[in-house]
Amino acid sequence: MISTARVPADKPVRIAFSLNDASDDTPPEDSIPLVFPELDQQLQPLPPCHDSEESMEVFKQHCQIAEEYHEVKKEITLLEQRKKELIAKLDQAEKEKVDAAELVREFEALTEENRTLRLAQSQCVEQLEKLRIQYQKRQGSS
């Protein structure tokens, strides 16, 4: 006897069917049941009424939709993971960009400091040369 009663929400549902167009509408007793654990209980396909061709067809469609749903959920999970990876890469690239900008500023500051120090050194060399000349003049006049 086949029951069409709803399964309680706290019990898992196991479903067996074949998507092949078989001439025999009754599923074999030894077939492996399909399980849709990723579906919420209210979305689980209800067992069909085997006496109704329309019920069997709706059941098959529901199972196909459940399989498609599972594939879409897997793809969403993969895409979310890829999104996280890309965000991490973007964060790293932005950090490297900031680091590069800081290095450019530091290089510019050091270049300016180097120019200033070279100018000061040149002025000191010039002043030292003037002092030597003055010292030599004093030594020569004494």
Swiss-Prot record:
Question: InterPro entries from the entry?
Answer: Map3k7cl
Q: In which tissues is it expressed?
A: Detected in lung and peripheral blood leukocytes. Expressed predominantly in peripheral blood leukocytes and ubiquitously in adult and fetal tissues. Also expressed strongly in breast carcinoma GI-101, colon adenocarcinoma GI-112, and prostatic adenocarcinoma PC3.
Source organism, top-level taxon: Eukaryota
Give the disulfide map: none
Its cellular-component GO annotations read: cytosol; nucleus
Q: What free text does the record give on domains?
A: Contains a C-terminal domain similar to that of the C-terminal section of MAP3K7.
Name of this protein: MAP3K7 C-terminal-like protein
